[in-house]
UniProtKB/Swiss-Prot annotation:
Family note: Belongs to the arthropod phospholipase D family. Class II subfamily.
Function comment: Dermonecrotic toxins cleave the phosphodiester linkage between the phosphate and headgroup of certain phospholipids (sphingolipid and lysolipid substrates), forming an alcohol (often choline) and a cyclic phosphate. This toxin acts on sphingomyelin (SM). It may also act on ceramide phosphoethanolamine (CPE), lysophosphatidylcholine (LPC) and lysophosphatidylethanolamine (LPE), but not on lysophosphatidylserine (LPS), and lysophosphatidylglycerol (LPG). It acts by transphosphatidylation, releasing exclusively cyclic phosphate products as second products.
Catalytic residues in the record: H5, H41
Chief place of localization: secreted
Location in or out of the cell: Secreted
Binding note for cofactor: Binds 1 Mg(2+) ion per subunit.
List of glycosylated residues: N250
A biological process term (GO) from this entry: lipid catabolic process
Protein name per Swiss-Prot or TrEMBL: Dermonecrotic toxin LarSicTox-alphaIB1aiii
Annotated keywords: Cytolysis, Dermonecrotic toxin, Disulfide bond, Glycoprotein, Hemolysis, Lipid degradation, Lipid metabolism, Lyase, Magnesium, Metal-binding, Secreted, Toxin
Cofactor(s) annotated in UniProt: Mg(2+)
Length: 273
């Protein structure tokens, strides 16, 4: 999965997908009542990027729905996964469940079109704080009470705080999650970060009793760091330059071993050689 980083304006969906992304990451900010409000990152953000592009969250979802609904004039067949980077740092811990409920209702109405031929992309809810694990239960509860529990088949999870792998496993246990787990590791492109924790996550993914299904690394903009991440065995790379990742995947060393994921590749299944 080539994951286009910080796609917060509808126009950027086309831009990043046309550069080679089959997945995008979008920032979601919340108001003081835990309603998802804007797709917005703000400053500081990655080096070389504009940090202030934004849409109202529900409007972004409508644009995203068009981009992922077969037959729509804006449809991109290869856009198959969306990571919502949930900026829950502005919320109190006891608002996490409410944030999940409100997020689910927004997605149901504006992205899934109330279950009637909505957008088809898989969705990852990426939560920065382990203490906010109740967001997951709130999300599930809202979809269930609205009569669409089947949409949970399209939803996965990530805790993005670079926490100890054991602590993350524990948070999932508390959240009642057994599957659909992506594990992120990374840092802004302005700084360097080693691959030690990525290797631990990959080892967990490949063990018989691990909780992780997929591992992605962020934010990678250079060819050499792309190669290093692929050598470590990641499933996804988040980038500001999808074309750079696509170029490296075309190199002979990687062409035989990796391919770009399509809609038929289940993002919740651990890949077995």
């Amino acid at each position: 999965w080539i994951m286009g980083h910080m796609v917060n304006a509808i126009a950027q969906i086309d831009e990043l997908v046309n550069l080679g992304a089959n997945s995008i990451e979008t920032d979601v900010s919340f108001d003081s009542s835990a309603n998802p409000e804007y797709t917005y990152h703000g400053v500081p953000c990655d080096c070389g990027r504009t940090c202030t592009k934004w849409e109202h969250f529900n409007e972004f979802l409508k644009g995203l729905r068009k981009a992922t609904t077969p037959g729509d004039s804006k449809y991109h067949e290869k856009l198959v996964l969306v990571v919502f980077d949930l900026k829950t740092g502005s919320l109190y811990d006891n608002q996490a469940s409410d944030a999940g409920k409100k997020l689910a209702k927004s997605l149901l109405q504006n992205y899934w079109n109330n279950g009637n031929n909505g957008g088809r992309a898989y969705i990852v809810l990426s939560i920065p704080n382990l203490a906010h694990y109740k967001l997951i239960a709130g999300f599930k509860e809202a979809l269930t009470s609205e009569g669409h529990p089947e949409l949970m088949d399209k939803v996965g999870y990530d805790f993005s705080g670079n926490d100890d792998i054991g602590d993350v496993a524990n948070a999932y246990k508390k959240a009642g999650v057994t599957g659909h787990v992506w594990q992120s590791d990374g840092i802004t492109n302005c700084l360097l970060r080693g691959l030690d924790r990525v290797r631990k996550a990959v080892a967990n993914r490949d063990s018989s009793n691990g909780y992780i299904n997929k591992v992605y690394y962020w934010t990678v903009d250079k060819r050499q760091s792309t190669r290093d991440a692929l050598d470590a065995g990641v499933d996804g790379i988040m980038t500001n330059y999808p074309d750079v990742i696509a170029d490296v995947l075309n190199e002979s060393a990687y062409k035989a071993k990796f391919r770009i994921a399509s809609y038929d590749d289940n993002p919740w299944e651990t890949f077995k050689n």
